[in-house]
Structure formats: C-alpha cells, structure tokens
Amino acid sequence: MPEFKVVVADPEKARSYQVEVKGEDAEKLIGKRIGDVIDGEIVGLPGYKLKITGGTDKDGFPMRPDIHGPVRVRLLLSGPPGFRPERKGERRRKTVRGNTISEDIVQVNTVIVEYGDKPVEELLGEGGEE
C-alpha cells in the first residue's frame, strides 16, 4: 500500500499543512501528474480543490513537470526545479524524477485552487510552516 506526505499550501494565509495519506486515498493519487487538480477530500478537505505542484521520491530527488512518466533520469540542468545555479550560465548534471506520481514518491506538494465551506485551520489544525 502506498503512503504519501501531502503538503497543502494555502496562498491566502501564506501557510502550509502536512497531511499523511494512506490506503485507498493514496491509491487515488497514483498516476496523477504535476498540474492535475485533485479533490481535497483525499487529504481531509471536503469541498476543496488542490493542484499538484511537485514532490520528491524516496531518495529525495525532485519531480520535474517537463519529464513524462514516473522515471528517474539524469539531465543537464541550468535552472530549477532540481538545480539552483550559483553563477550565470552554470549548468550541472542532476538526477530528477518524472512528472507522474508512483509508489516511489514520498512527498506530494499541492496548492489550494478552490476553497470549501470550512476554513483549512478547522479541518487540518494549526499550520506548522510560515
């Protein structure tokens, strides 16, 4: 059974919330891609819509929206995600993950695009990050 840590970012309050997703709800995330909009009920936010913005796999490699499938590849990168150059024109070969969620993904980053009736703090508790 897959298990994910879903980070829900609230752009209105500038806070983020981390939710553990297991079982059938985690199965619903497999096969989704970066940019897909999912139902918030998966993470305990009924009435909300969440957009997948990225994530990391079990070894900490970041997902990139321009690589298709759940594959891990080594690319020559000149900018984010996956590499932040320190000098202008710097490039480096880095390992990154594709844009599709698989069982190897551990963390899924999302942002709220449509709000429900109840506030997020009431449904998920107090946010940990600012």
Curated annotation (Swiss-Prot):
UniProt GO cellular component terms: ribonucleoprotein complex; ribosome
Keyword Endoplasmic reticulum included in the entry's annotation: no
Name the InterPro entries for this protein.
Ribosomal_eS6, Ribosomal_eS6_arc, Ribosomal_eS6_CS
Q: Where is this region: Disordered?
A: 78-98
Question: Is the Cytoplasm keyword given for this protein?
Answer: no
Q: Which UniProt keywords apply?
A: Ribonucleoprotein, Ribosomal protein
Biological-process GO terms, alphabetical: translation
Q: Provide the family line.
A: Belongs to the eukaryotic ribosomal protein eS6 family.
PANTHER family from the UniProt entry: 40S RIBOSOMAL PROTEIN S6
NCBIfam families in alphabetical order = PRK04290.1-3 (NF003294)
Protein name as it appears in the record: Small ribosomal subunit protein eS6
Q: Which organism is it from?
A: Methanopyrus kandleri (strain AV19 / DSM 6324 / JCM 9639 / NBRC 100938)
